[in-house]
């Protein structure tokens, strides 16, 4: 299906908002209307089927800008995204009881606020990041003050999961092949970089001529020092997130090898961001594309769309739909807040909805219950013009942050 709803221009400088679903909450609509009023938005805002209200900007939005960038639209989990790889294993080769595999992964990969006791990542990953980070810190020493034990923390967090909706999964596809899939971002330093520059943009907006419809939409104009510094920092955080997922995948495979028959990694491997900004060309224009909870879906480009814990996930191939700026959804999308989910559901509900999956089933993860998310099959049906399904995955083991 294609565009299902268009919010037409409501102000002199506003652009249309093109939405690939009918299921859009009123708060998201109001957020999108405000963003559409920014004079540097190009052509239109595209909204994916997993849309829901977000902090700073609407989750599921694709924001094309010319000569400006909005730090809050990228957010604080800069470079958050997915990594998946197919193994040369069949489902029948997995043990009946997956608890030992889960224990082995949890011992190898710190989750939540935890970090490695020693730096685990290889020097080939650390050194390039360290060299690129030095000039950023020199220009903005305030970043160091925002993160305890700065150098040790960012290095020891490389190869760690984090919390919230971040996860590690073992999945089975339609051919009974085994996949490892994970979801994580740029960890503590990415959060610090995002927070620091969001506040800097708000501070600078107070002294800039021109109306901003919401302080969360404060921006840096191209040509300014802050614009250049933010682009440098956000690109660093995106690379860190990419390397974090690579390192985690290495550790996971290292953890499960002793417990499984000999296996190889296949060439089907994907590592993609879904909270990020990049320079791209669309409609013949050089643009900054911010994907806030959306993945790139260029022609035949592979991507990952995870469902909620207990639902299906998808490996997809892009169709390069121009109206979406070559994008698609990044998941199912929440249909309620975490606090509301904790009120509506209990531990028994979680146990019932995750039956057959090796995962946490305690009250601490009730906010991640499948019913708190939109129906992934409906989300996928709404974006058939954007992507083609390559593989359908079903989780058998899930580790939450």
Tell where the protein language model's regions lie, with residue ranges.
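Domain-length cofactor-binding catalytic modules of enzymes
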Residues: 2-31, 40-45, 53-59, 63, ...
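Beta-strand elements of modular eukaryotic interaction domains
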Residues: 36
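A generic, well-ordered mixed alpha/beta core segment in the N-terminal half of proteins
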Residues: 73-139
């Amino acid at each position: 299906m294609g565009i299902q709803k268009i919010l037409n221009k409501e102000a002199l400088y506003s652009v249309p908002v093109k939405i690939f679903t009918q299921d859009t909450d009123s708060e998201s609509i109001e957020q999108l209307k405000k963003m559409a009023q920014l004079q540097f938005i190009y052509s239109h805002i595209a909204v994916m089927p997993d849309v829901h209200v977000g902090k700073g900007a609407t989750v599921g939005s694709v924001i094309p800008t010319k000569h400006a960038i909005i730090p809050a639209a990228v957010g604080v989990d800069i470079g958050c995204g997915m990594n998946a790889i197919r193994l040369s294993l069949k489902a029948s080769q997995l043990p009946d009881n997956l608890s030992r595999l889960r224990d082995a992964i949890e011992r190898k990969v710190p989750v939540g606020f935890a970090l490695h006791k020693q730096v685990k990542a290889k020097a080939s990953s650390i050194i390039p990041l360290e060299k690129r980070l030095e000039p950023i810190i020199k220009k903005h020493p305030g970043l160091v003050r925002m993160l305890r034990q700065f150098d040790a923390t960012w290095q020891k967090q490389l190869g760690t999961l984090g919390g919230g909706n971040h996860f590690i999964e073992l999945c089975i596809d339609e051919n009974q092949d085994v996949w490892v899939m994970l979801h994580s971002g740029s960890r503590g330093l990415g959060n610090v970089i995002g927070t620091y520059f969001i506040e800097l943009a708000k501070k600078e907006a107070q002294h800039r001529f021109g109306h901003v419809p919401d302080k969360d939409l404060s921006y840096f104009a191209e040509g300014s020092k802050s614009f250049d510094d933010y682009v440098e920092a956000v690109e660093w955080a995106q690379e860190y997130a990419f390397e974090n997922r690579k390192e985690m995948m290495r550790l996971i495979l290292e953890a499960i090898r002793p417990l499984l028959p000999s296996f190889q990694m296949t060439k089907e491997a994907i590592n993609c961001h879904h909270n990020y900004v990049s320079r791209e060309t669309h409609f013949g224009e050089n643009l900054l594309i911010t994907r806030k909870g959306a993945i790139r879906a260029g022609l035949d480009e592979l991507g990952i769309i995870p469902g909620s814990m207990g639902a299906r996930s998808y490996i997809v191939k892009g169709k390069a739909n121009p109206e979406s700026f070559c994008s698609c959804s990044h998941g199912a999308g929440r249909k309620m807040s975490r606090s509301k989910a904790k009120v509506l559901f209990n531990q028994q509900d979680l146990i019932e909805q995750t039956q057959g999956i090796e995962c946490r089933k305690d009250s601490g993860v009730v906010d991640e219950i499948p019913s708190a998310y939109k129906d992934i099959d409906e989300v996928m049906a709404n974006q058939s013009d954007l992507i083609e399904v390559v593989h359908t995955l079903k989780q058998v083991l899930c580790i939450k942050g």
